[in-house]
Amino acid sequence: MSVIAYLLILGAYLLGSISSAVIFCRLAGLPDPREHGSHNPGATNVLRIGGKLSALGVLMADILKGMLPVSLGFYLELPISVIGFIALAACLGHIFPVFFKFQGGKGVATAFGAIIPMGYSVAGLAVGTWLFVFLISGYSSLSAVITALIVPLYIWWFSSELTFPVALVCCLLVYRHHDNIQRLWRGQEDRGWKKKHSRQNGY
């Protein structure tokens, strides 16, 4: 790989390591999301602790953390395989942020942002899959896990060169939901449309 490729991969990881949830909560005077709610620095937990606008800001910022470096990779016409690893680096940064003791979020929004430049068809199918599962089950965590399991098939169909790195990203997402999966198995996971949310669920 070229020096530019290595720099972009490093830059994607560092950008992903910036915790949007912590920053927006500080700006809005909200509690630290790492110490309240689900203790997860993500948009869902920010919404849970009372910041609707902050939650929206976190969601958009986390999406951009994945979308911007991947878009730059396409703009620079880097090899598809390199772009895939740029996406992986951004998600690794969000999940294991170097600036926050490697304790980050679950990576759903950042992974979605990374997928958008790869193809609107794949991104649309991912959103559709998430919504379909959520409307049937009511579980946002189950929706995220099933979508993560299916997205590699979408990528393989539309851009097979990206299948391996995207599959790695999706494996990370499933791993980060292991607590949710255990609660789903035990029947202890709260449904997304309930007013009372579980303190253990969230992105």
UniProtKB/Swiss-Prot annotation:
Enzyme Commission number: 2.3.1.275
Catalytic activity: an acyl phosphate + sn-glycerol 3-phosphate = a 1-acyl-sn-glycero-3-phosphate + phosphate
Major subcellular location class: membrane
Pfam families: G3P_acyltransf (PF02660)
First-level EC class: transferase
A GO term for molecular function: acyl-phosphate glycerol-3-phosphate acyltransferase activity
Pathway annotation: Lipid metabolism; phospholipid metabolism
Keywords, alphabetical: Cell inner membrane, Cell membrane, Lipid biosynthesis, Lipid metabolism, Membrane, Phospholipid biosynthesis, Phospholipid metabolism, Transferase, Transmembrane, Transmembrane helix
Keyword DNA-binding in record: no
Membrane protein topology class: Multi-pass membrane protein
SMART domains: G3P_acyltransf (SM01207)
Transmembrane parts of this sequence: 4-24, 56-76, 80-100, 115-135, 149-169
A Gene Ontology biological process term: phospholipid biosynthetic process
InterPro entries (alphabetical): G3P_acylTferase_PlsY
Subcellular location: Cell inner membrane
GO cellular component terms, A-Z: plasma membrane
Family in the record: Belongs to the PlsY family.
HAMAP family given in the database record: PlsY
Subunit and partners: Probably interacts with PlsX.
Cited function: Catalyzes the transfer of an acyl group from acyl-phosphate (acyl-PO(4)) to glycerol-3-phosphate (G3P) to form lysophosphatidic acid (LPA). This enzyme utilizes acyl-phosphate as fatty acyl donor, but not acyl-CoA or acyl-ACP.
NCBIfam families: glycerol-3-phosphate 1-O-acyltransferase PlsY (TIGR00023)
Record-given protein name: Glycerol-3-phosphate acyltransferase
Species the sequence originates in: Glaesserella parasuis serovar 5 (strain SH0165) (Haemophilus parasuis)
Name of the encoding gene: plsY
